Amino acid sequence: MPRPYRLGRRNFIGIGMAGGLSLLSDPETLTALEGQHRDRPGRAKNVLVILEQGGMSHTDTWDPKPDTLVQQLSPYKPISTSVPGMQFTELLPHTSKVAHKLSVIRSMHHTTGIANGHPKGTQYTLSGHVPGGPLEMPDIGSVVAHRMGSRCGYLSPYIMAPGNSEQAKESRLGFMPYDTQVFKTGGRDLSEPGWKVPGLALNKAIGESRLKTRLNLLGNLDVGLPNHHSKKAQGWQQAIAQAEESLLNPKSKIAFDLEQEPDQLRDAYGRGHRGQCYLLGRRLIEQDVRFVTIDVREPLTPKTPGGTNLNWDHHDFIYATGTCNLPGAGGGGRGRYGIGTWWMMGSVDQAFAALINDMDDRGLLEDTLVCFVTEFGRTPKLNKAQGRDHWTGAYSIVMAGAGVPGGQIIGASDRQGGYVTQSAYTPDDYAATVYRKLGLNLEKPLRAPDGRPILLAANGNPIREVF
């Protein structure tokens, strides 16, 4: 069922300005507005986002539909969880044991046609704003870095790992300062022995002393620039200082060193790329990185033969027991594995359950908001190639930590999983929830380059059930 139209805060400002409230574009008025709506300490101090891009099938995972039409039925049956009456599918046996720590939101949806594809859908998820329009909107992570700053003096406040696949290309700085831009670790396969962040080590041919001499020279040159004191120039200077600290501080390399972890724990997460990505996310949160996004996409390695495109875009043979590139498959089958294989839900289930338990054991769930998201779901109806296509009418995300009540299902979709029937939420609401959990005041505007007020998640409201 489509969500009723509501007047968003952005619309309200627009109507107000049309009615003569052009005072909002006045710098003094904006300053007063910002002072009135201050940020306050929130329950969350950090955020860890697991972005499983490609459009994960909700009816095969978090929202089982055993009573749907036979021709649409998932082969994966509902199973019980640690919470009576709360069910996942049998693709989540490990995660079902930590259900009492999770809030599963089964009523996500969006109705804008522009976000029905992966690039725009991912942008929508990363920013909490419908893509398009004259002003490019920044990632939630960049906004958080701008408003809250860094808790870790030697690493960027916003890190994406590995940040080298399709979804990472949709990350946007927008109009935020350069020092809030996401730092992407890179790395083809984090499960490789001795994996390190490319470019983080200092070039031995230069050395620390020579580097500092060059940076001092750069600083002296900057002083003479006419725009030295502009916000843009200051952002660049802060970004350079941040990069210098990351290069020279030995803690930086340790933060990314997965070999610091005991073998037993690495095994618990799973020794593949996905498990080690999730583990790195926990390590970065432990280093007080403010906002971490893990964007897993299994790489082509000897461990994943033929797997060149292992995200969740299962247009062809979604239930294949190996490769989806079977006779009759289209382009979506090439390089992809079935949803029930180890490389897909098998590794997700193990890694996510291990992550939640590990963070809970270390006390990190007390003040870290963990979000498991995808940009949309998949069609209730199987297509001719026995796959499921893009679907924005209903899908699921998961939250945990930072005071999120565990063991609850939020919202509902219909018998087929096609449309939301209860407590509909959008990516705008998801963004508003993240901001509110961090203590950011949604009424305190950001400023566009021309001074206009831009509200956080302007068309969203926090998901009330997680507070």
Each PLM stretch: what is its role?
Residues 1-467:
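Ligand-binding pockets and gating/stacking loops
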